[in-house]
Amino acid sequence: MNQEVMNLFNPQVPAQHFDSIRISIASPEKILSWSYGEIKKPETINYRTFKPERDGLFCARIFGPIKDYECLCGKYKRMKYKGIICEKCGVEVTLSRVRRERMGHIELAAPVAHIWFLKSLPSRISTLLDMTLKDVERVLYFENYIVTEPGLTSLKQNQLLSEEEYMIAVDEFGEDQFTAMIGAEAIYEMLASMNLEKIAGDLRAELAETTSDLKQKKFMKRLKIVENFMESGNRPEWMIMKVVPVIPPDLRPLVPLDGGRFATSDLNDLYRRVINRNNRLKRLIELRAPGIIIRNEKRMLQESVDALFDNGRRGRVITGANKRPLKSLSDMLKGKQGRFRQNLLGKRVDYSGRSVIVTGPELKLHQCGLPKKMALELFKPFIYARLDAKGYSSTVKQAKKLVEKEKPEVWDILDEVIREHPVLLNRAPTLHRLGIQAFEPMLVEGKAIQLHPLVCTAFNADFDGDQMAVHVPLSLEAQLEARVLMMSTNNILHPANGHPIIVPSQDMVLGLYYLSIMNQNEPGEGMAFSDIGELHHALENKVVTLHAKIRGRFKTVDADGKPVSKIHETTPGRMLIGELLPKNVNVPFDTCNQEMTKKNISKMIDTVYRHCGQKDTVIFCDRIMQLGFSHACRAGISFGKDDMVIPDSKVKIVGDTEALVKEYEQQYNDGLITQGEKYNKVVDAWGKATEKVAEEMMARIKAVEFDPETGRQKPMNSIYMMSHSGARGSPNQMRQLGGMRGLMAKPSGEIIETPIISNFKEGLTVNEYFNSTHGARKGLADTALKTANSGYLTRRLVDVAQDCIVNSVDCGTDKGLTMTAIVDAGQIVASIGARILGRTALDDIDNPVTGENIVKAGTLIDEADVAIIEKAGIQSVRIRSALTCEVQIGVCGVCYGRDLARGTPVNMGEAVGVIAAQSIGEPGTQLTMRTFHLGGTANVVDQSFLEASYEGTIQIKNRNILRNSEGVLIAMGRNMSVTILDERGVERSSQRVAYGSKIFVDDGDKVKRGQRLAEWDPYTRPMMTEVEGTVHFEDLVDGLSVLEATDESTGITKRQVIDWRSTPRGSDLKPAIIIKDASGAVAKLSRGGEARFHLSVDAILSVEPGSKVSQGDVLARSPLESAKTKDITGGLPRVAELFEARRPKDHAIIAEIDGTIRLGRDYKNKRRVMIEPAEDGVEPVEYLIPKGKPFHLQEGDYIEKGEYILDGNPAPHDILAIKGVEALASYLVNEIQEVYRLQGVVINDKHIEVIVRQMLQKVEITDAGDSQYIVGDNVDRIEMEDMNDRLIEEGKKPAYGEPVLLGITKASLQTPSFISAASFQETTKVLTEAAIAGKTDTLQGLKENVIVGRLIPAGTGGTMTQIRRIATSRDDLILEERRKGTGAGSANQMLQDMTDQVPAAE
């Protein structure tokens, strides 16, 4: 690799155009071929003359001259002696920059092992030799001898001998009967004598025979390394070095400081160490020193070479004079400060400046204000050129003088230069691509950059002291791209969700909202206006106010573009907004004839963009901004203490709640409820009280009041206006100002039982203030951590998806995903329309009633189609998705669908992976960090009942219902669901019903929307009996498995099951409740099996032994408070957990087959659950379940594939294995979306799908067929498909594999490109693996290309590459033809053929 990278920077060797980079282990011959000479002395430079010492680390003879074209002794100077080697000092006369590329070497007196191959786990040397790492180290570091050739003695091959044992063996067998060696020589001999082909054959044979999993893994690891060596042409003994390369001196400089001291690179220290020890070792060997001394010196040499390559990897870190660890070669590459991330992936640029930003409301959307001083500095070269061209100056020096004096002509020229020359503005942190946009600069006085207010959302900028950087695109192409792609007017929509991002905010919203308010009894109410001019006239003369109800004629155009007018009931304010709307039949006056909240403004801009195009939208946005600002100013909305309204009923609500809480305390004291239940109920009660106070407050604020004297409607409350319009503040904040602050959380996340009753207007008491500081400080600490975590998540996402580019128009697959609306607790949270908008239909979509076609297969679904689909009541639509796209590299345009930032089908070469990563990572800072500890609040309230979300007929699936003694229907099934069908029999909604719920409807009942279907106790999970009889206890031994707990404060006893396995005596117990029938035998259940109900830990018994029970009665209840207080990972950690595909802590166990539950013999603390398969020929599956977990299945229950045997969060790997890719995709998409939805962030599903596609690129071989693979190998899906195509062609058996889900970090490290992986994480490990396998990087992703300094293969770069490739192949063809002399005819024909291949999309 080095030679090729050297060529990149070497002016004398023209940089060859290369298509790929290969990395492999350097053989000693290769190292010598790079080298220009051996370094024999540890000296660097002579401290008096400052000239480099000969044969030292900076030797000019080896590395080249210090000054350009001048030898060291000064005999030859200047260009004319170029290439001559001075006979006196031996230095070649050439450029001094060769000191950046010429390498040297050190001949080692004894071989040493390369630490990367030794210590980078798994250790390659030890795996290859089939020894443990510890043993290899003992040999290498001279602790043990190893037998390399046992001869006829009783010693074994590779046996380790200590010094004593070796001596004894020599005495016993004689020195020439066997060979035992020590140190790197021994390992070198062993590696050199390996026959790789034979080893590979043996390993394959053993693999086929062995049955043990462990051995298989071990053999596979070894086989992989052996095959890597065979395929790459590397030799194993190259992992032991006899020659150490020395990097060029200018890459490890020695800089003189003032005061005669030197600053040096750490590498020089490390090299000096190696050279010193090497020279000492040579001398010792010449002097024939005793073996022990030589061995010690060899060990030290090994250690010093280790430190040079990777300091601190083994043994102590070598430190410099100031006790700071020395930076080794590995450290130069690693981490944020390493070569990859510091210098190759991001470089500093020239022609840039930064300054504070201020608002520029008089700018147009595509402009920014650039301070004159800054512009003068940034555009200097252009100004010099102009001055020269216009004849103001004849030399650069003169031009410089003119500019420095700031002559008037300079300013005129600056104006010319700047005109139509866009500049890029960037605000750090650049979280998504809208963080850098292009503007046309306008020169402004002062020193601050002026920014257009509408682009603030995209930059996430405000004017409280933010700074921004300006960059000047220099080349014509760069200017073109800036104008066409990055101009702020071309970025109206948000790439994450396709909503407009150029939306007025804050003051503008407030002004527009104020304009659009409609009040009653205003002066001029009921007037009619014929046109807008008349209206302006009336407003100027105060005949009518902005908020009066009037009738006005609004002029617009019809479908043919002819002017039409229509009379609307509206207000003058709304007419003013309507005046700005572009005239279009699809943008009627109704779009603005409503209260202009931020949401409605966004919808209005969206409508204008979809129907009138970009130019009109930009003009409209600019005008609407002006209008908003001017009316916000005129409205004079202020914020006073009296605007915070405290509801009169607050005192009563608080009093009632306090009484309720007292009652709960009493119930607890009477022993009716447990401590946990009391806490939950109290927290609930206060939560409800806070809501109620807030509702009352909102009602007071919203109330319409009239002035008794004038009869006019009183002006609206200003705080309410700000919050309701979406300008600033939320109902939650209003609640804290005027209602009550409510419950607070401790830093641990638990909720404190005593709420804060005061609000900020009344002021908090000392205790309340103290209680509220907890949560507030936690919030600040979280924010600081969040930024770093969110940034790291974005980095991993970008890294995994960076090579996902739109590479072809259509892959023609017939696979896709099924999209349905997402319903949560009966509410539709994401409609089907929103989910399929901008995606490609996989099948024809027909109206289910009329059967007419709505959308043809393979067409993009747009807004109009969505409206028809939703109206037709279609429940599910199959669409194309990036997940199922079958393009080999990247994705195809049809599967991806619409480019959200443009609203058109996606372009070829769009880097959709990076866009996806940014869209998911950018809102990361808005997500919460905390894991929620659920102390009962809202959760419980949500989940205690089911309501019908539609009208229709009930259908109960898997019906299993009993009537209990009170005559109520009880759900006894584990997997029952209540479905609502509409009048056409189409399923509208389906909801699971929890076991033990009371059900209020039955099959065939008609229900209205909002009717209650079922309810259950949210605090406990019941265990119910299906048979009647008498209760008997089994293995419920006092003090061992059941505890009669007497609550100290109440004196009431209750019986609770305790963990019986904690004592040796209780280990064989199986606590259960048995129901016996009249004859005294154990009653039989309807599905076979006995009525024996096993109890889980913490169950509270509800019956006494001997009592009678009937069907549907509760025997025991398990409190769910244990489940309620468990952490739910939310926010950022949850998103990271899903993308990293980690197994959740208490993960669910999912049934792999359909079948019947059978309980096997229990182990000590695990319970055996078997599923007896429903179909023949399938093996039964066994699961082990920890005994303390609430397990609610009984013997004989029927269970379907994919159902939960044990509740919890499922592990994504299980979903993939059991239910397949589509189920996994929908699970991941929904779970990730849920987290973002809670924060109100909208992200399109396709972004998450692109990332999940990247996580699913590998397959695990289940059947190798006739391929090279081994069962259990992880290989690239594409690679396997290619291999299979070849095998099938040859008539052999193809290989089969199961898809494997990798977390994003793992997927990034396993990309085909080693350059990309190395620059991500674990640099040494990645490079070690790549070198052994002799990997080739074909430079397909974005990152690799940036690192080698090319245009990325996306966007314009991709097109250029493609054109260049076609051009080169044409040239080759023509040359070929010329060589053959076949004339031009056939060449032209071939060219024609090739022209047809160029994709049309370019």
Curated annotation (Swiss-Prot):
Any one biological process term the GO annotation gives: DNA-templated transcription
Catalytic activity: RNA(n) + a ribonucleoside 5'-triphosphate = RNA(n+1) + diphosphate
Gene3D superfamilies named among the record's database cross-references: 1.10.132.30, 1.10.150.390, 1.10.1790.20, 1.10.40.90, 2.40.40.20, 2.40.50.100, RNA polymerase II, clamp domain (4.10.860.120), RNA polymerase Rpb1, domain 3 (1.10.274.100)
Co-factor binding comment: Binds 1 Mg(2+) ion per subunit.
Any one of the GO CC terms: DNA-directed RNA polymerase complex
One GO molecular-function entry: zinc ion binding
Listed cofactors: Mg(2+); Zn(2+)
Subunit description: The RNAP catalytic core consists of 2 alpha, 1 beta, 1 beta' and 1 omega subunit. When a sigma factor is associated with the core the holoenzyme is formed, which can initiate transcription.
Its biological purpose: DNA-dependent RNA polymerase catalyzes the transcription of DNA into RNA using the four ribonucleoside triphosphates as substrates.
Record-given protein name: DNA-directed RNA polymerase subunit beta'
Taxonomic source organism: Agrobacterium fabrum (strain C58 / ATCC 33970)
Gene this protein is translated from: rpoC
